[in-house]
From Swiss-Prot:
The modification Phosphoserine is found at residues 35, 126. One of its GO terms (cellular component) is plasma membrane. Displays low GTPase activity and exists predominantly in the GTP-bound form. It comes from Pongo abelii. CDD domains: ARHI_like (cd04140). InterPro entries: P-loop_NTPase, Small_GTP-bd, Small_GTPase, Small_GTPase_Ras-type. This is GTP-binding protein Di-Ras2. GTP binds at residues 14-21, 33-39, 61-65, 121-124, 152-153. PANTHER family: RAS, DI-RAS, AND RHEB FAMILY MEMBERS OF SMALL GTPASE SUPERFAMILY. Gene3D superfamilies: P-loop containing nucleotide triphosphate hydrolases.
Amino acid sequence: MPEQSNDYRVAVFGAGGVGKSSLVLRFVKGTFRESYIPTVEDTYRRVISCDKSICTLQITDTTGSHQFPAMQRLSISKGHAFILVYSITSRQSLEELKPIYEQICEIKGDVESIPIMLVGNKCDESPSREVQSSEAEALARTWKCAFMETSAKLNHNVKELFQELLNLEKRRTVSLQIDGKKSKQQKRKEKLKGKCVIM
């Protein structure tokens, strides 16, 4: 039973250069690198507490190229939640997410119960925008997933992205504690049932 597994696996997909690694590194390590280094596949871990026991948030930063279809399928089949990243400065990068989403549907079946975030990164580069947020929001509604714009460079909406992703989890109660503060809504929920909190 995957719910009893002691890790929670999040896979990050998107075209090369959209900022997948930058988002993950900003979240896990609080760092940002200006130079682009293509990723084959990296996995990052953070210890979280889940329903009063320890588990691991495991984030797989996948390759942006299409050279490794078997690795992509494996990341989807093992994943509990998915982040689909495009750059707001590249319409092509949004188009490249469509076959990935279709593959998630094919492998996972009913995706309505699976946390998926559509993420428009590089919102700090608004003058070069090719994808309007309204267009991405419409696609997210079609895909029945959540949508957010982020900037790994400015650290805008990065923690919030992971918080929102965990909030979408329906089979388990998982939550990200941001800066040690909990909202009143979180506190109310915690009184009702167990919670996952990043340490």
